[in-house]
Amino acid sequence: MTSETPKQYGRVMLKISGEALMGDQGFGLNPPTVARIANEVDSVAKMGVEVCMVIGGGNIFRGLQGSAQGMERTTADYMGMLATVMNALAMQSALEALGHHCRVISAIRMDEVCEPYIRRRAIRHLEKKRIVIFAAGTGNPYFTTDTAATLRASEMNCEAIFKGTKVDGVYDKDPVKHADAKRYGDVSYDEVLQKHLGVMDASAIALARDNKLPIIVFSLDAPGGFRSILAGSGTYTRVHV
């Protein structure tokens, strides 16, 4: 079953986890997987949709885990931010191999490898149909990449956040563990928060709600899934007011 067809989006934010880049590995980057995701993004960009991205860093380093093991939380979070830059550069390389112009923009200055975050410049890149990858989170510890994606999507005037996951939407319970799990077609921000449905962290959901920014949750593993939703089909859950 599919949800109601959403309107055509002109500018979107794609949020994926760092783990999505691992493939079947237990750590790091799997080049064929990175290339496959790049192809998905490229196919959407070729529709004329302006695409920006945020990629997590959990395939390389996760700040919360480092903190739990005795590392100072602030230091651990900064290490996690650096991991997102590595993932962003890998995705940039894969997209450029497909012939698409792409810019990595970091919230932490490292001018030798990527651009600093300047809002107007980032918007101009999107207007020129370049794919923009935002790296290093918000540039501040204690904020997740989900929150960073929602923040940047709001600043870029995106029409929706597309959250690519391992499942094809939001379920009332873990569909991997429970065969009777039911997928939501549409769900409100408040219900996601009240029922702890795990779409994004609470700060990200609250920010999306305050800015009336819909979140489309879909399976990143489904070939052509990202493009099919933008074309008016596909299976997903829409989080909205």
From Swiss-Prot:
User: What's the source species for this entry?
Assistant: Paracoccus zeaxanthinifaciens
Q: Which GO terms describe its biological process?
A: 'de novo' CTP biosynthetic process; UDP biosynthetic process
List localization entries. Answer: Cytoplasm
Source species, domain of life? Bacteria
* Annotated segments matching region Involved in allosteric activation by GTP: 23-28
Q: Per the record, GO CC terms? A: cytoplasm
Question: Which residues are recorded as binding ATP?
Answer: 15-18, 58, 62, 165, 171, 174
Q: Does the keyword ATP-binding apply?
A: yes
Protein name stated in the entry? Uridylate kinase
The residues the record assigns to binding UMP are 57, 77, 138-145
Q: What is the activity-regulation note?
A: Allosterically activated by GTP. Inhibited by UTP.
Q: What is the lineage of its organism?
A: Bacteria, Pseudomonadati, Pseudomonadota, Alphaproteobacteria, Rhodobacterales
Q: What does this protein do?
A: Catalyzes the reversible phosphorylation of UMP to UDP.
> Keywords for this entry?
Allosteric enzyme, ATP-binding, Cytoplasm, Kinase, Nucleotide-binding, Pyrimidine biosynthesis, Transferase
Q: Which InterPro entries match?
A: AceGlu_kinase-like_sf, Asp/Glu/Uridylate_kinase, Uridylate_kinase, Uridylate_kinase_bac
Q: What is its main location?
A: cytoplasm
Q: Which NCBIfam families match?
A: pyrH_bact
Top EC class, one word: transferase
Q: Which reaction does it catalyse?
A: UMP + ATP = UDP + ADP
Subunit? Homohexamer.
Name the family the entry cites.
Answer: Belongs to the UMP kinase family.
Show the CDD domains listed in the entry.
Answer: AAK_UMPK-PyrH-Ec
Instruction: Tell me the pathway.
Output: Pyrimidine metabolism; CTP biosynthesis via de novo pathway; UDP from UMP (UMPK route): step 1/1
